[in-house]
Regions:
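Pyridoxal 5′-phosphate
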Residues: 1-363
Length: 363
């Protein structure tokens, strides 16, 4: 099997599996308990918290463990909206966990993006300027999970803070891609499952001084996120960030070159160069159903996606609609690389050539 859907989830690393199993079989105490077993579990949580903080240049007390990026996003946004008067400003290509909150919120501005998925900075400033009576709460994805476009976060930070706003970013896709620092960012979400950690563990960074209303009540995580800590998965996340390896993009680049050279009427969707995630290749095969292509590749043991795993289905992705792709939006396939080889890329390209030829001949 050739797995090219790493933007959806990643295979747990061996070190992660070992850490999880050790907690399940040896250090399975409740970290709130005062006895030795509980304190050993508490130490594991503390070590993982420090590892995560070190990864992004934060303080350990600024890290909240959650069940994943969706919960982290919800806590960041709802935790402020439920507490004080804010106007939510976001974009039209955000993750569904942000989009769904935005759809339910009355005081809202959605910023358009261009054909490559970049936010319109002028529109952002205009939205900030007309937010007179409430504090602006801006939520902008650091890098898009479908088309791989990376936003100019430095400019966004400067703009948001110029108008006294609070900035949240969903960094789920950028964290595995390159080293980033939270300087200037007020809140940041990400998920363990994109880093080789288990599904069901996530992080919310909250800058010291920002107070959130919990959406899950309880005494854990300094009363910011209730529920007994998921010690095994927290331990796994700690190992994942300690062993993180950033991609260089060589196999992805090779794959894109071969696809564009061997298959007519196709093109790369989204940004290029340094402004794109190094593992992402979203390709439009004009006139070909992306859903059919995903199924046909799966029959050959190749795992890809027709978009975000949170959006995948018959309806065209809101991200592809937002970048004005028209009918081409129905023909986009996302390939996201992990530790794949050029030999595997060649196999995938060979199958793509066959599928495109067959489907176009039969259309």
């Amino acid at each position: 099997m050739i797995y090219l859907d790493n933007a959806a989830t990643t295979k747990p690393k061996p070190e992660v599996v070992s850490a999880v199993m050790k907690c399940l079989t040896e250090t399975w105490g409740n970290p709130s308990s005062l006895h030795r077993m509980g304190q050993d579990a508490k130490a594991i949580v503390g070590d993982a918290r420090k590892a995560v903080a070190d990864l992004i240049g934060a303080k350990p007390n600024e890290i909240i463990f959650t069940s994943g990026a969706c919960e982290s996003n919800s806590l960041a946004i709802c935790g402020l909206l439920n507490k004080d008067s804010y106007t939510l400003i976001t974009t039209n290509i955000e993750h569904k966990s942000i989009m769904n909150i935005a759809d339910d919120w009355f005081i809202l501005h959605k910023i358009d993006v261009d054909k490559n998925g970049f936010i319109d900075i002028i529109r952002l400033e205009q939205a900030l300027q007309i937010t007179k009576y409430n504090t602006p709460l801006v939520s902008i994805q650091y890098a898009n999970n479908e088309i791989g476009t990376i936003q100019d976060m430095k400019r966004i930070i400067e703009m948001v803070h110029k108008y006294g706003g609070i900035l949240h970013t969903d960094a789920t896709q950028i964290i595995p891609d390159r080293k980033i620092d939270v300087s200037g960012i007020d809140m940041m979400s990400f998920s363990g499952q994109k880093l080789g950690a288990p599904k069901g563990i996530g992080v919310l960074y909250v800058r010291e001084g920002i107070e959130l209303s919990p959406i899950i009540y309880g005494s854990q995580e300094k009363s910011r996120r209730g529920g007994t800590e998921n010690v095994p998965y927290i331990a796994g996340l700690g190992e994942a960030v300690r062993h993180i390896e950033y991609p260089i993009g060589e196999v992805r680049d090779y794959f894109v070159q071969q696809v564009l050279a061997q298959i007519p009427d196709c093109y790369l969707v989204g940004a290029t160069g340094k402004d794109r995630l190094k593992n992402n290749a979203s390709v439009c095969f004009k006139g070909i159903s992306s859903e059919m292509m995903v199924v046909m590749l799966d029959q050959k043991g190749i795992c890809v996606s027709s978009g975000s795993a949170c959006n995948a289905g018959m309806e065209v992705s809101h991200v592809l609609k937002a970048i004005s792709m028209g009918d081409d939006a129905k023909s986009v396939v996302r390939f996201t690389f992990g530790d794949n080889t050029k030999a595997e890329a060649d196999v995938v390209v060979e199958e793509l050539v066959k599928i495109c030829k067959k489907m176009r001949e039969n259309s």
